[in-house]
């Protein structure tokens, strides 16, 4: 436990170089005949596809092997956070890819999925005489602090961002409360105990781990329960419900209740990113991934109950029904809408202003909609050919011609 410290963005070139000298950041040799994927345990088409396998089928059509990051024992967990594999595609929380693109290496933003009304909540002990944010004046609010300099402190970023937003929405500032930091090693990413055996599917990670009740994903709950702090930020309604189920905690503020959508940016929207090397040298690999995501996303949108049963294996909703309620209004087809790009920009600006990244960049230049557009076009052309094949002597191809249809 420590008092709040002011951050300065680290020199990532130096940190990465030192990590390599120490024998860290081991990764498989580059082979463009295989693509690795990695994702976070959140709402995404990729997490649904773990059970469908449709993206793997798309890659088989072009003779490329599609593998989960940890399906190869040569890879540790760091590529999920710092993209140190040229041939990896990541679908996960927003803050790590922002950090990578700003300070480590150039990447391409291929698409996002946003879960609206998930800005986070403020939690206190259920029997404390605290019912409003104003009651926290002079009280202690916890803040996680990763000591791992190789990757970004995404837990701490979302907590700090959420705390500041809640204070502001209640006419308060950081001066009204005491922010207490909780440093932790955060050094498991190449730990031998976390490295084996290899996993073909990300959901295998949870076969021996009860993630819905694992306090590693609610890092400040113990400190709050023991009275070391008076309040903690919880990333979303999802995690707060798990805390409330214990009967020990309650929520006194929820950013989801406000009409302002710019408050709903707790490490979201989830972002799809690839390296610029993949995008420029092998664009078909990025397009193929997005074809899979579009197909799976459309299926999930049409079969929300089935998608909920799959996602419940990996996400932090209480059960399948709770998962269904969480995804009922979510569009699982990735997009790069203007509104979602603004949400990305909000996250980036917070990281820059608070010393989590050193370099600024233009989110609209980071986004590359041509890959999503090409994937959608290829799927549409294929569907058109399927539907017209039985009705026309020669399959029409309207999308590639300049002629008018109708």
Question: For the regions a protein language model found, what residue spans apply to each?
Answer:
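Secondary-structure end/capping motifs
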Residues: 279-358
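Short, surface-exposed acidic
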Residues: 61-69, 172-179, 284, 315-328, ...
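Conserved C-terminal helix/tail region of periplasmic/extracytoplasmic solute-binding proteins
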Residues: 2-14, 352-406
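Pocket-lining segment of extracytoplasmic ligand-binding domains
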Residues: 188-310
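Extracytoplasmic/secreted proteins, especially bacterial periplasmic and envelope-associated proteins
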Residues: 50, 54, 95, 99, ...
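Short, solvent-exposed loop/beta-turn-alpha elements that line the ligand-binding surface or hinge
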Residues: 56-61, 258-262, 332-339
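Short, glycine-/small- and polar/acidic-enriched structural segments
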Residues: 4-192, 236, 394-406
């Amino acid at each position: 436990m420590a008092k709040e410290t002011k951050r300065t963005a680290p020199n990532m070139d130096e940190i990465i170089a030192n990590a390599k000298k120490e024998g860290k950041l081991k990764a498989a040799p580059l082979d463009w005949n295989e693509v690795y994927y990695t994702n976070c345990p959140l709402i995404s088409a990729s997490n649904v596809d773990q059970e469908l396998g449709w993206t793997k089928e798309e890659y088989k059509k072009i003779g490329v092997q599609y593998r989960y990051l940890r399906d190869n024992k040569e890879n540790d967990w760091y590529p999920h956070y710092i993209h140190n594999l040229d041939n990896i595609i990541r679908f996960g929380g927003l803050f790590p890819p922002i950090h990578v693109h700003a300070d480590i290496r150039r990447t391409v933003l291929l698409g996002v999925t946003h879960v609206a009304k998930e800005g986070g909540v403020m939690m206190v002990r259920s029997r404390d005489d605290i019912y409003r944010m104003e009651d926290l004046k002079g009280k202690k609010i916890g803040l996680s602090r990763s000591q791992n300099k190789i990757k970004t402190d995404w837990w701490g970023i979302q907590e700090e961002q959420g705390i500041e937003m809640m204070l502001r929405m209640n006419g308060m500032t950081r001066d009204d409360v005491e922010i207490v930091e909780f440093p932790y090693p955060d050094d498991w990413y190449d730990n031998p105990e976390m490295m084996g055996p290899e996993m073909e599917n990300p959901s295998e990670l949870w076969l021996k781990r009860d993630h819905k009740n694992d306090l590693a994903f609610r890092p400040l709950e113990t400190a709050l329960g023991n009275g070391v702090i008076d309040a903690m930020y919880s990333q979303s309604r999802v995690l707060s419900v798990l805390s409330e189920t214990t009967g020990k905690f309650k929520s006194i503020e929820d950013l989801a209740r406000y009409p302002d959508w710019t408050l709903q940016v707790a490490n979201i929207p989830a972002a799809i990113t690839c390296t610029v090397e993949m995008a420029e040298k092998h664009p078909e690999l990025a397009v193929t991934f997005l074809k899979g995501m579009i197909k799976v996303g459309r299926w999930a949108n049409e079969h929300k109950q089935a998608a909920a049963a799959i996602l419940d294996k990996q996400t932090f909703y209480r059960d399948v029904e709770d998962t269904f309620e969480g995804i009922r209004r979510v569009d699982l087809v990735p997009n790069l809408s203007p509104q979602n790009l603004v949400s990305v920009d909000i996250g980036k600006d917070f990281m820059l202003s608070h010393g989590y990244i050193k370099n600024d960049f233009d989110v609209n230049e980071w986004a590359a909609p041509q890959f999503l557009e090409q994937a959608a076009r290829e799927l549409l052309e294929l569907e058109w050919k399927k539907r017209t094949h039985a009705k026309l002597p020669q399959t029409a191809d309207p999308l590639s011609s300049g002629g008018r249809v109708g």
